[in-house]
Amino acid sequence: KLAPTNLDIRNTAGSALDQILIGNVYEGIVARDSKNQVAPAIASSWETSKDGLTYTFHLNKNMTFSNGDKLDAEDVAWSINELIAKGYHDADALAAVSKVEAKDADTAVITLKTPNSNLLWTLTGRAGLVFDKDAKYDLKTQAVGSGPYTVAKFVENSSITLKANEKYWGKNKAKTPTVVVKYLADDNAAVNALKSGDVQVLAPITENLAEPF
């Protein structure tokens, strides 16, 4: 279900890409914690000006993308500016943004036209994802992110294989070396796959389908 037809998270709608790529492969300037609150991610801390128009983000040091490229404030500024300029998915949620700049390698500044109390929350989703401004790859079939996993294999409408990112800069490194996410056509096929051991985890599953287990 919800099987993605491609990996282009900047242009393709649907929750499947959010679920599999955000936090695993791509990371945002901020994230959501287990309590669904805004939490540090690429930015370790931030502050807001008294007038609510300027957000200053202080980035973690020594960050890299999965291809080994350095991740800094230039990538942050480029990613958000590109999203707005090209009208990528969720660009409309950043309508209040005037500009995004790299103050220095470790500091990114977002300036607003009018205050937006939802800005940080918006940046926990697609709008805040940070991409490698120098990387050249096919976004529909490949992914270059800064998260704990990389995309090792993608089969359209079928499966995504994630592999632990050996270059991951963060503390919460991948604990499972390889994860294969399969998208099954219907509930019965999914339950049969779980019964046979073809899959180890099944989600979502209804109460009736869970009864045999």
Where are these regions (language model features)?
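Short, solvent-exposed loop/turn elements at domain surfaces
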Residues: 4-11, 37-39, 118-121, 159-161, ...
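Aromatic- and charge-enriched surface segment that lines or borders ligand/interaction sites
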Residues: 44-87, 103, 109, 193-196
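N-terminal lobe/hinge region of extracytoplasmic solute-binding protein
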Residues: 1-50, 144-145
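Ligand-site clamp/hinge motif
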Residues: 137, 167-212
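Surface-exposed binding/hinge segments that line
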Residues: 92-133, 153
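Short, well-ordered beta-strand elements
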Residues: 1-3, 54-57, 76-79, 108-110, ...
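Gly/Pro-rich hinge or "lid" segments in bacterial periplasmic/extracellular proteins
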Residues: 123-174, 178
